């Protein structure tokens, strides 16, 4: 069964065709990074206008690469939230238009669930119950999954998301946008020599990164940072220490079979290394191209929703503030 996935929640316009929820036939992403980097962050109005220009060519390329016509598509899965309203509207309306014109079922997908399904596209099928650490630009969530479509939120950030913290720290250090990859690169030539705080929040699986960011800012303002690479490595280590330790504690408490990693920050090299080295349980870490925003993960998640009866009407709307549990 082939699913067409469409994703436009932030600054990537993406379309993909996935067979049976696990085989990627095509996965096209048109990135707007070059456009937004001159502003140091995503400009929502610019993003939605760019999605409008890219959406139809990207969908058409994805179908062509998969050698698939609309008549072979069993359902269209599209991200309807969370994300930027103007960006989401473009993908959702493209999906609705095709669904209406071709009589194809429409399946709305929560972007955060989509990120988790990168783990179903990585060659091995995860075992339930599993604990997923989703770390992206807008979210840092620890989610327990006991089956497809069953999400229980065990912990979340109380302030900045991990990706947001990376992006803000990069700005403080004068590194390029997007900040996460820039800090990752700079860290490779640095030593984690700065003493930065870690927020453990005892008795809770929640996270907090705003104090760490402020501590870095103070050190920079006081002239106590002599090497950008060392500061980047110190900041990255502080974030990763907390993410890994809290994830392993939570996995132990809930007695899961496996840990899954998801979201853009899952592309971080130190996080990938530390989590797999320190975990006594199997850890699923998707390839980097499936961690950042793409439509194959939306198609995969949409497939598992669709085969268990999930389908949406054409009056389905965007939900910019959707959480991992609704
Ligand atoms: O999941 P994503 O592509 O978009 C959202 O849904 O937010 O995540 C984007 C976030 C950005 O904050 C970016 O800086 C971060 O993921 N990121 C990284 C790395 N690659 C992307 N953070 C740390 N290390 C990386 N290598
Ligand atoms: Zn994302």
Swiss-Prot record:
Entry EC number(s): 2.3.1.234
Binding site for Fe cation: 111, 115, 293
GO molecular function annotation: iron ion binding; N(6)-L-threonylcarbamoyladenine synthase activity
Cofactor dependency: Fe(2+)
GO cellular component, one term: cytoplasm
Principal subcellular localisation of the protein: cytoplasm
Subcellular location: Cytoplasm
InterPro entries, A to Z: ATPase_NBD (IPR043129), Gcp-like_dom (IPR000905), KAE1/TsaD (IPR017861), TsaD (IPR022450)
Record-given protein name: tRNA N6-adenosine threonylcarbamoyltransferase
Organismal lineage: Bacteria, Bacillati, Chloroflexota, Dehalococcoidia, Dehalococcoidales
């Amino acid at each position: 069964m082939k699913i067409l996935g469409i994703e436009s929640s932030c600054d990537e316009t993406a379309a993909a065709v996935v067979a049976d929820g696990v085989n990627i036939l095509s996965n096209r992403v048109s990135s707007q990074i070059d456009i937004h980097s001159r502003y140091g962050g995503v400009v929502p109005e610019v993003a939605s206008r760019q999605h409008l220009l890219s959406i139809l060519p990207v969908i058409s390329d994805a179908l062509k690469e998969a050698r698939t016509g609309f008549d072979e598509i069993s359902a269209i899965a599209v991200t309807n939230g969370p994300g930027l309203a103007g960006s989401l509207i473009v993908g959702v309306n493209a999906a609705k238009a095709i669904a209406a014109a071709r009589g194809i079922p429409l399946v709305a997908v929560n972007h955060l669930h989509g990120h988790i399904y990168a783990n179903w596209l990585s060659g091995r099928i995860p075992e339930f119950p599993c604990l997923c650490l989703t770390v992206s630009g807008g979210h840092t969530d620890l989610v327990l999954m006991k089956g497809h479509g069953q999400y229980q939120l065990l912990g979340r950030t109380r302030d900045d998301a991990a990706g947001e913290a990376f992006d803000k720290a990069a700005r403080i250090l004068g590194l390029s946008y997007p900040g996460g990859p820039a800090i990752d690169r700079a860290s490779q030539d640095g030593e984690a020599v700065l003493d930065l705080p870690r927020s453990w929040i005892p008795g809770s699986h929640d996270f907090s990164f705003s104090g760490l960011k402020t501590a870095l800012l103070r050190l920079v303002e006081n002239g106590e940072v002599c090497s950008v690479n060392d500061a980047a490595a110190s900041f990255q280590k502080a974030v990763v220490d907390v993410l890994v330790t809290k994830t392993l504690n939570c996995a132990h408490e809930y007695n899961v079979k496996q840990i899954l990693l998801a979201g853009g920050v899952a592309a971080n090299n130190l996080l990938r290394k530390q989590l797999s080295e320190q975990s006594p349980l199997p850890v699923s870490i998707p390839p980097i191209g499936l961690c950042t925003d793409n439509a194959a993960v939306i198609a995969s998640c949409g497939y598992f929703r669709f085969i268990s009866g999930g389908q949406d009407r054409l009056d389905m709307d965007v939900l910019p503030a959707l959480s991992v549990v609704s």
